[in-house]
Amino acid sequence: MFQRLNKMFVGEVTTSSSHEPEFSEKEDDEWILVDFIDTCTGFSAEEEEEDEDIGEESSAEHTSVFSCLPTSLECLADTSDSCFLQFESCPMEESWFITPPPCFTAGGLTTIKVETSPMENLLIEHPSMSVYAVHNSCPGLSEASCGNDDYNSSGPRMEAQSELGTHIHCCVAALAAQATFLEQPKSFRPSQWIKGHSERQSLNRNGLRRQNLTRDCHTRQMKHRCWAVHQPCPRQYNY
């Protein structure tokens, strides 16, 4: 194994040393043109010559290109239409089958038939999305079909009306609750507040003490007025 690797490396060195290196530059336009049709025709011409010499056994070894392709591309093998491209048999061992798009084949004059997947036209739609609803307005339809269409079209309308009714009911309930909350301070009178405040204050210890003191002071003043003569106070300034 190592000897083979040595020979490979030594052989490359000798060949590179015997020939002078040639540098060539190619302008690349970011596109690579693959002449696959010419290569296939070249391979087919060689196979025809070999078939004349060898026979039918060699022709059985080279299978058609379309035998190894999936079922979606089997329509390419139909040679009945002359306007489509036709690929002849060529060996597919360790190679890729390149099919350029139609706009790059012969200036867009020829096209390649490719089967479209049914999932491409699939539209996943939510039931609440009524934007894509198709209303059939053909006059030639029967009355029964028109009645069914009217019933089906009125279904979303009824649902929308019921949703609108529930929304309005919720708004009315919220407004009523807010109105009752705002009317509570208006109905609250100051007399009720004074009465409740006095009741709460009467139960307090300090409040009871103040009431007792006011009563005592009032009784003492009444007794003093009964037996004592009230004299006016002296004037501070003489006018």
Curated annotation (Swiss-Prot):
It holds the Pfam family DOR. A motif (LIR) lies at residues 25-37. GO terms for biological process: apoptotic process; autophagic cell death; autophagosome assembly; cellular response to ethanol; cellular response to hydroperoxide; cellular response to methyl methanesulfonate; cellular response to UV; negative regulation of cell migration. The keyword Heme does not apply. It is found in: Cytoplasm, Cytosol; Nucleus; Nucleus, PML body; Cytoplasmic vesicle, Autophagosome. Keywords: Activator, Antioxidant, Apoptosis, Autophagy, Cytoplasm, Cytoplasmic vesicle, Nucleus, Transcription, Transcription regulation, Tumor suppressor. Its main location: cytoplasm. Induction: In chronic pancreatitis tissue, expression is suppressed by camostat mesilate, a serine protease inhibitor, and by Saiko-keishi-to, a herbal medicine. GO terms for cellular component: autophagosome; cytoplasmic vesicle; cytosol; nucleus; PML body. Disulfide bonds: none annotated. Specifically expressed by acinar cells of chronic pancreatitis tissue. One of its GO terms (molecular function) is antioxidant activity. InterPro entries: TP53INP. Antiproliferative and proapoptotic protein involved in cell stress response which acts as a dual regulator of transcription and autophagy. Acts as a positive regulator of autophagy. In response to cellular stress or activation of autophagy, relocates to autophagosomes where it interacts with autophagosome-associated proteins GABARAP, GABARAPL1/L2, MAP1LC3A/B/C and regulates autophagy. Acts as an antioxidant and plays a major role in p53/TP53-driven oxidative stress response. The LC3 interacting region (LIR) motif mediates interaction with GABARAP, GABARAPL1, GABARAPL2, MAP1LC3A, MAP1LC3B and MAP1LC3C. Interacts with p53/TP53 and HIPK2. Interacts with PRKCG, GABARAP, GABARAPL1, GABARAPL2, MAP1LC3A, MAP1LC3B and MAP1LC3C. PANTHER family: DIABETES AND OBESITY REGULATED, ISOFORM G, TUMOR PROTEIN P53-INDUCIBLE NUCLEAR PROTEIN 1. This is Tumor protein p53-inducible nuclear protein 1.
